Curated annotation (Swiss-Prot):
Residues at the active site: E246, C280 (nucleophile)
Name of the protein described by the UniProt record: Gamma-aminobutyraldehyde dehydrogenase
Organism the protein comes from: Escherichia coli O9:H4 (strain HS)
Function field: Catalyzes the oxidation 4-aminobutanal (gamma-aminobutyraldehyde) to 4-aminobutanoate (gamma-aminobutyrate or GABA). This is the second step in one of two pathways for putrescine degradation, where putrescine is converted into 4-aminobutanoate via 4-aminobutanal. Also functions as a 5-aminopentanal dehydrogenase in a a L-lysine degradation pathway to succinate that proceeds via cadaverine, glutarate and L-2-hydroxyglutarate.
One annotated GO biological process: putrescine catabolic process
Annotated pathway: Amine and polyamine degradation; putrescine degradation; 4-aminobutanoate from 4-aminobutanal: step 1/1; Amino-acid degradation
Keyword Oxidoreductase (UniProt): yes
Note: 4-aminobutanal can spontaneously cyclize to 1-pyrroline, and 5-aminopentanal to 1-piperideine.
Pfam families associated with the record: Aldedh
């Protein structure tokens, strides 16, 4: 397995402390990788800064060609990437290959096209004898911090728009799941000029902090927890860096009495438990109107009970393990606290799976109340709660009564209600009669403590640029 870092166009071994990388399906150590040293972090940033002088002035066509080549080699090596992702994350292999790899390739291809559509503005004469122009220019060096739930996908979301806009990037994947990013480094080094892409390995304290705090870094992009976002914002405040934050969610799923219950059940069974629930948009916080509450709980419980946990390389496996032992304990603790309330009922699941690996049974909890921790706090596991509501006004207020603001969905046959409720929800995305669906052309990003800035779409590309005014006297 490729375990070297990419610094200034060269694959080099880390010079810091070795860290174990685990297979969460077995709990075994896959390998140990040496972290980047402080000197290597500095070298990566300085390489990116040096490369920016030329890369930032390349034409959109040149940048697009590089991104398209990278998309092609990812596609050609799709099986290799899927196997690495499956072993390192515990994802079902068929899901990694069939769902994630095509989406990752599409992100690079989309931004290759978008790079050629990012225009400034010829503003004209607002002062006699002077012509103004508006430019959108790259920022410089971007430090990108990717999470452990979708390692390669999030690397794509961060690399593609930044590079398309003309920036140079130093990427740090999670130390828990670094293998696909390091494999990407091996393939990218022969496509992009030296220093344009640098990929490091290490923990937040030893690598993330010196990277994000480096004086030559102009922007920090994070997908991670609220706590990590808060730390980075505080850590970078003195250098006034631009920050781009996607910090998780607790998606409300509002099910009205007139909803298609079978569609809701099928949707939540899929969208609430995909990737073992380790998704910031997971359909995890259901509000069911009183007329269909009992029916929904019964049917959904039966459906969730059929979800198959198992070995990632088994074609019939629907749920793999959680990413780490520490995360398994966090999920288990959240469910135990919910059970201890006395009013929350476990419909199915609610326990760790016996045997090796970090498996937690797909869980449905009914009877949750608005102020319960299971409703208010992100669990980030295969755990869905159901809360009864009376009317539209109540459920909109409850849905918005959350520190999160990333994703939401509304299930109803009433088109007017769908528009009315969607307009009032304080979430970056609202789906109607579906959930979880993402495309490269549409923006993804949150409000409130879920963060700010957009991934994907032309809005995502613009986030990696600076607006400049040029005035010419004539």
């Amino acid at each position: 397995m490729q375990h070297k870092l990419l610094i200034n166009g060269e694959l080099v071994s880390g010079e810091g402390e070795k860290q174990p990388v685990y297979n969460p399906a077995t709990g075994d150590v896959l390998l140990e990788i040496a972290e980047a040293s402080a000197e290597q972090v500095d070298a990566a940033v300085r390489a990116a800064d040096a490369a920016f002088a030329e890369w930032g002035q390349t034409t959109p066509k040149v940048r697009a060609e590089c991104l398209l080549k990278l998309a092609d080699v990812i596609e050609e090596n799709g099986q290799v990437f899927a196997e690495l992702e499956s072993r390192n994350c515990g994802k079902p292999l068929h899901s990694a290959f069939n769902d994630e790899i095509p989406a990752i390739v599409d992100v690079f291809r989309f931004f290759a096209g978008a790079a050629r559509c990012l225009n400034g503005l010829a503003a004209g004469e607002y002062l006699e004898g002077h012509t103004s122009m508006i430019r959108r220019d790259p920022l410089g060096v971007v430090a990108s911090i990717a999470p452990w739930n979708y390692p390669l996908m999030m690397a794509a979301w961060k690399l593609a728009p930044a590079l398309a806009a003309g920036n140079c990037v130093v990427l740090k994947p999670s130390e828990i799941t670094p293998l696909t990013a390091l494999k990407l480094a091996e393939l990218a080094k022969d496509i992009f000029p030296a220093g344009v892409i640098n990929i490091l390995f290490g923990r937040g304290k030893t690598v993330g902090d010196p990277l994000t705090g480096h004086p030559k870094v102009r922007m920090v992009s994070l997908t991670g927890s609220i706590a990590t976002g808060e730390h980075i914002i505080s850590h970078t405040a003195s250098s006034i860096k631009r920050t781009h934050m996607e910090l998780g969610g607790k998606a409300p799923v509002i099910v009205f009495d007139d909803a298609d219950i079978e569609a809701v059940v099928e949707g939540v069974r899929t969208f609430g438990y995909y990737n073992a629930g380790q998704d910031c948009t997971a359909a995890c916080r259901i509000y069911a109107q009183k007329g269909i509450y009992d029916t929904l709980v019964e049917k959904l419980g039966a459906a969730v009970a059929t979800l198959k946990s198992g070995a990632p390389d088994d074609e019939s496996t629907e749920l793999g393990p959680l990413s780490s032992l520490a995360h398994l304990e966090r999920v288990s603790k959240a469910v135990e606290e919910a059970k201890a309330t006395g009013h929350i009922k476990v419909i199915t699941g609610g326990e760790k799976r016996k045997g090796n690996g970090y498996y937690y049974a797909p869980t449905l909890l009914a009877g949750a109340l608005q102020d319960d921790a299971i409703v208010q706090k992100e669990v980030f596991g295969p755990v869905v709660s159901v809360t009864l509501f009376d009317n539209e006004e109540q459920v909109v207020n409850w849905a918005n009564d959350s520190q999160y603001g990333l994703a939401s969905s509304v299930w109803t046959k009433d088109v007017g209600r769908a528009h009315r409720v969607s307009a009032r929800l304080q979430y970056g995305c609202t789906w109607v009669n579906t959930h979880f669906m993402l495309v490269s052309e549409m923006p993804h990003g949150g409000q409130k403590l879920s963060g700010y800035g957009k991934d994907m779409s032309l809005y995502g590309l613009e986030d990696y640029t600076v607006v400049r005014h040029v005035m010419v006297k004539h």
